[in-house]
Amino acid sequence: MRPDGPRDPVTGPDSGPEPPFPIKLSGPVIKGFGRGSKELGIPTANIPPDGLSDYPDLQVGVYYGVVALDPSRFTSETTILPAVLSIGYNPFYKNTTRSVEIHIMPPLSSPSPTANGEAGQVKFNKLPDFYGTKLNLLILGYIRPEYDYVSLEALVEDIRIDCEVARQSLQRKAYVSYLSGQDCSEAVQEQRKWLTSF
């Protein structure tokens, strides 16, 4: 069960990702359990969990990072966007297979759709269906472990907070360079190049 008490507004060191981060995962967007949009109102892009075998010590839980989608399905330009994701079994739904469920958020320069509002009244970011589109994901930090919840509303509220923690964490200088490409190190430039290579 989720512990009581307030959540930290940011996670990860201010100096930037530390091992094992950043973690690279990629794959085609596949159909998930069909609950993200229908039951939760939180659309997700699921990718096969095969790449997790390269990270056997990675714990289940909620993470944040940046994603890029193959532009051939959308526009001529690849955009890197912030993301919050779940890796695990989702105890609330008693899943028996591990999944990688990614919620792609709007650019940090846009107003946050999850900053305010009670569960059930928040408008999470929505994108058109893109099943089969290749997605590259760079995981930059860990937010929290998986929890079971007493209600669907409690789950949605925690996901809303996850989105805000991800946004606040990514707005720090050492992280925002992954999105903007400005004032970034050679290592970050290489990782951005990988993100946008399809």
Curated annotation (Swiss-Prot):
Q: Where is this region: Disordered?
A: 1-27
Please give the GO cellular component terms listed in this UniProt entry. mitochondrion
Top-level lineage group:
Eukaryota
Range of residues in the leader sequence: none
Care to name a GO molecular-function term for this sequence? riboflavin kinase activity
Keywords on record? ATP-binding, Flavoprotein, FMN, Kinase, Magnesium, Metal-binding, Nucleotide-binding, Transferase, Zinc
Keyword Kinase attached: yes
Q: How is the cofactor bound?
A: Zinc or magnesium.
Family classification: Belongs to the flavokinase family.
The UniProt function text for this chain reads:
Catalyzes the phosphorylation of riboflavin (vitamin B2) to form flavin mononucleotide (FMN) coenzyme.
Q: What is this protein called?
A: Riboflavin kinase
